[in-house]
């Protein structure tokens, strides 16, 4: 790889030229990394709902043309000035949010919301110089959440790169750079269920099932899956879900249904849909005295959370979480180790595999609601 150090690399990338239109495979020029940046060779990437959301560009600032993608795994090709903890050949996961290690958030054991590198969906350039590292015929192609993994090579800030065990299979652990860690950490790091406890999971997509996986790992004895789509229930059993509730089957609020099932409420709940009614239900279904509800899903910008203050005074706790409260550089390597020592199972999240040339099929699968994670193989 050393022959490319300091040089512009021309490679294939799937470019989103405009909202909602199929990605186009293009030859792009990828500039060398600048100060505190790393250039990565992406080997595997997967598709997350966030990619689809910003590709559709409904309700946010459309930034096009851009290279989407943020769940991935690869190898360091070269490093920019000032980068000391990474070297060419290192196996890494790029992450959509970062850890500068210098700000108040990074120095706090309680936060992972880095002031410098926190996710910014509107920024299509590198923070170092306000320029893009991607171009076609000299014209810039914008970045996406600092990662842009739908390209054979990408440039990422060093603070958004987790160095991992080189023995870890990159085609499996790539899913840990976003959704799976988000759900897993919401349970293990924030809800913190104890062995033998009861947990309700609202929403049984990939993030919700990762939250269920966290409850399974923690030793919860009852894991109640809540979803409006009954076809998800069978698959959820693989992730430790023991019981299912479809709110459509009942005439009363689902929080009342769960309270009756569990002698007053579950010990913990994790909400992974982003629907405000589900968020309220997730809070109101936990037991008074000790119940903890954790919100993961991102709500509509106009949504308002309404509940009676007595629900708090009766000693219920409501928490929020971002990326499972994991610090990308410090914590994600240990999540990879959970997979390596067979504590965490990742294979069951991976339902499809496609070559890079067929990336638009991955969008079709997600739009149809088929499968959980589709791994896109960059090399033919």
Swiss-Prot record:
Q: What is its EC number?
A: 1.1.1.1
**Superkingdom of this entry's organism?**
Eukaryota
Subcellular location(s) of the protein? Cytoplasm
Q: Where does an alcohol bind?
A: 50, 70
Q: Where does NAD(+) bind?
A: 50, 203-208, 227, 232, 273, 296-298, 323, 373
Provide the reaction this enzyme catalyses: a primary alcohol + NAD(+) = an aldehyde + NADH + H(+); a secondary alcohol + NAD(+) = a ketone + NADH + H(+)
Offer a single GO CC term for the protein. Answer: cytosol
**SUPFAM superfamilies for the chain:** GroES-like (SSF50129), NAD(P)-binding Rossmann-fold domains (SSF51735)
User: A biological process (GO) annotation for this entry?
Assistant: formaldehyde catabolic process
Write out the GO MF terms.
alcohol dehydrogenase (NAD+) activity; S-(hydroxymethyl)glutathione dehydrogenase [NAD(P)+] activity; zinc ion binding
InterPro entries per record: ADH-like_C, ADH-like_N, ADH_Zn_CS, GroES-like_sf, NAD(P)-bd_dom_sf
State where Zn(2+) 2 binds: 100, 103, 106, 114
Group of enzyme by EC? oxidoreductase
Where in the chain are disulfide-linked cysteines found? Answer: none
Keywords, in A-Z order? Cytoplasm, Metal-binding, NAD, Oxidoreductase, Zinc
| Keyword Zinc belongs to the record | yes
Identify the Pfam families for this entry: ADH_N, ADH_zinc_N
Keyword check for Cytoplasm: yes
Q: Which residues bind Zn(2+) 1?
A: 48, 50, 70, 178
Membership in a protein family: Belongs to the zinc-containing alcohol dehydrogenase family.
Subunit and interaction comment:
Homodimer. Homotetramer.
What is this protein called in UniProt?
Alcohol dehydrogenase 3
* Gene that encodes it: ADH3
């Amino acid at each position: 790889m050393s022959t490319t150090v300091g040089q512009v690399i021309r490679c294939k990338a799937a470019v989103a030229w405009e909202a909602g239109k199929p990605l186009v495979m293009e030859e792009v020029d990828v500039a060398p990394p600048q100060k505190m940046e790393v250039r990565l060779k992406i080997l595997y990437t997967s598709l997350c709902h966030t990619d689809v959301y910003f590709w559709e560009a409904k309700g946010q600032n459309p930034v096009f043309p851009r290279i989407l993608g943020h769940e991935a795994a690869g190898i360091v090709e070269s490093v920019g000035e000032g980068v000391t903890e990474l070297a060419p050949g290192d196996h890494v996961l790029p992450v959509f949010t970062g850890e500068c290690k210098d700000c108040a958030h990074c120095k706090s054991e309680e936060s992972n919301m880095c002031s410098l590198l926190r996710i910014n969906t509107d920024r299509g350039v590198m923070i170092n110089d306000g320029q893009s590292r991607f171009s076609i015929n000299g014209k810039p192609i914008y970045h996406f959440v600092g990662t842009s993994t739908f390209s054979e090579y990408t440039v990422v800030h060093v603070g958004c790169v987790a160095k991992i065990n080189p023995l870890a299979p990159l085609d499996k652990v790539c899913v840990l750079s976003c959704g799976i860690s988000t759900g897993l950490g919401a349970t293990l790091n924030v809800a913190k269920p104890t062995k033998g406890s009861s947990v309700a999971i609202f929403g049984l997509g990939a993030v919700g099932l990762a939250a269920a996986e966290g409850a399974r790992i923690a030793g919860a004895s009852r894991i109640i899956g809540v979803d409006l789509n009954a076809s998800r229930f069978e698959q959820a059993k693989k992730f430790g879900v023991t019981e299912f509730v479809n709110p459509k089957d009942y005439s009363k609020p689902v929080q009342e249904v769960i309270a009756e099932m569990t002698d007053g409420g579950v010990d913990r709940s994790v909400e992974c849909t982003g629907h405000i009614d589900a968020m309220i239900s997730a809070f109101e279904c936990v037991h008074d005295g000790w119940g903890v509800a954790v919100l993961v899903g991102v709500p509509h910008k106009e949504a308002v959370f309404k509940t009676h203050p007595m629900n708090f005074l009766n000693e219920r706790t409501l928490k929020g979480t971002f990326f499972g409260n994991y610090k990308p550089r410090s914590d994600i390597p240990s999540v990879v180790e959970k997979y390596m020592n067979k504590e965490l199972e990742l294979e069951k999240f991976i339902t499809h595999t496609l070559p890079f040339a067929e990336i638009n099929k991955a969008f079709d699968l997600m739009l149809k609601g088929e499968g959980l994670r589709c791994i896109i193989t960059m090399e033919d």
